[in-house]
């Protein structure tokens, strides 16, 4: 197993241009495919998850070109659903942002499609989405366990109608439904049951759908109405914002490390909800400065907070490790959906924080962290989860440093993360 030892770092300083957002990249690729016209995506994320989406689209006959650095993609839209008389098997790794939207989109046209993934993907629920698609007339069957991939779709189109979906588990299910609804044969009304998690991710979806010319009536995130007869039309060019979740590690480093870190590519005007991570850091005592397309974090004495993190579920993980450098206890609540991500992030985070000496209380949907007087060096298991690896890089600010097991798992969203981190760090 590969390991990376991060030696103690006293402070950080510098500027980081954040790679494109994973959430926006994969949504935009799918909408560009369904749209009429040619779309150029600029600042596309080059990572495993995006590669899985691109490979699937290529297999399905979608034509696109990539720049040498794979951050600019020009794609010729199909002007509607994918229509084929062939059977396809598509391997989607552990990319939820490819599995869920593709599962929905492939029901719109014709063909037989089998969607598979890594073993962890077979543990990530998709049943709520499949149930909703079946309400609209989709023919989908599970190949192993009910409610989980792999699955096979026999596509004949979606009829339209009223559909209910549980919003309390993952916003990706609602995102997938919203993106396909305009291309159903009839009008679609989506009623959301339960409290909608990760609401800002729905804002990303609605923003992109509007850019591609589709109208959605949003009734307070509890009911969405999508008229029939709509079509996606390419806006020509889509600029992908920097990934706000990826920005969180560098902002936390600035807050902990006593220097100044500026992240560019994401700022006050960002559509991503995870930019509000900077507000959580400010609540801990960090000095935060906002620009339209940048955020600056400066070091300060941090203190624990008690906060509902439902609105920033991915970036909230970074608060868990930043809490090791804060005075007092930090409690984060309303984060049950950590449990159905790349790994059970609540259990994994609790386990690894205890290794470095923290006192941790893990609940059904919360975590409470009391930092040790002095963290101890530990080998951190990353569970093939990119965010675990990046979060625990912050332990480099402890006198003991840290060892990250399987650091290459950051390839899911940020392949050169540790190089970027090292460029900011000033060793002791």
Curated annotation (Swiss-Prot):
Protein's name according to its UniProt entry: 3-phosphoshikimate 1-carboxyvinyltransferase
Catalytic activity: 3-phosphoshikimate + phosphoenolpyruvate = 5-O-(1-carboxyvinyl)-3-phosphoshikimate + phosphate
Protein's organism: Shewanella amazonensis (strain ATCC BAA-1098 / SB2B)
A Gene Ontology molecular function term of the record: 3-phosphoshikimate 1-carboxyvinyltransferase activity
Function: Catalyzes the transfer of the enolpyruvyl moiety of phosphoenolpyruvate (PEP) to the 5-hydroxyl of shikimate-3-phosphate (S3P) to produce enolpyruvyl shikimate-3-phosphate and inorganic phosphate.
Pfam families reported in the protein's UniProt record: EPSP_synthase
Keywords from the named record: Amino-acid biosynthesis, Aromatic amino acid biosynthesis, Cytoplasm, Transferase
Membrane-spanning segments: none
GO biological process, any: chorismate biosynthetic process
Enzyme active site: 314
Keyword Disulfide bond: no
